[in-house]
């Protein structure tokens, strides 16, 4: 995320510089929470989180080159947004299952359901962030209802898939 901040600042891509700064603040908050509450997140969860973050910031930051349109790979590759939402929510689902699962006195189904709800709620917060950015600051159009509903769908699907994969019995 820090590389995206530097690259977007260098290229004068103010839209994605703003997104990257918010992402950097969010990442710093997660690191502080991890340290304060001693979550000890597993390495594979951290790597799983790194992939969609890198895809998101790289994909959008390419718009600074003015080669792939205003929103970089999000406009050049129509499926990019769906994939990033699926993988990002999948990482959130894994984190929720990891953190909440041992504390629940319920089975795998309840853990997967709750983790999917957490991932979907985080995805909803992203959609509200995009809407507020568009409404208050005139950022780029996010695709209206179709884009928002598809994002919410892939958030739920990714959150479910991540939690389901994380909680599956290991052989």
Predicted regions and their residues:
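Interfacial helix-loop-helix junctions of multi-pass membrane proteins
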Residues: 63-73, 80-81, 124-160
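Hydrophobic alpha-helical transmembrane segments
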Residues: 45-47, 112-117, 149-153
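Short hydrophobic/aromatic segments of transmembrane alpha-helices and their interfaces
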Residues: 43, 71-72, 111-114, 137-138
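Membrane-interfacial alpha-helical segments at the cytosolic side of multi-pass membrane proteins
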Residues: 87-104, 135-140, 156-169
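Internal alpha-helical transmembrane segments of multi-pass membrane proteins
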Residues: 102-120
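"…centered on the first transmembrane helix and the immediately adjacent amphipathic helix/loop
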Residues: 1-90, 94
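Alpha-helical transmembrane segments of helical membrane proteins, especially in multi-pass transport
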Residues: 91, 115-122, 127
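Membrane-water interface at transmembrane helix exits
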Residues: 7, 34, 55, 59, ...
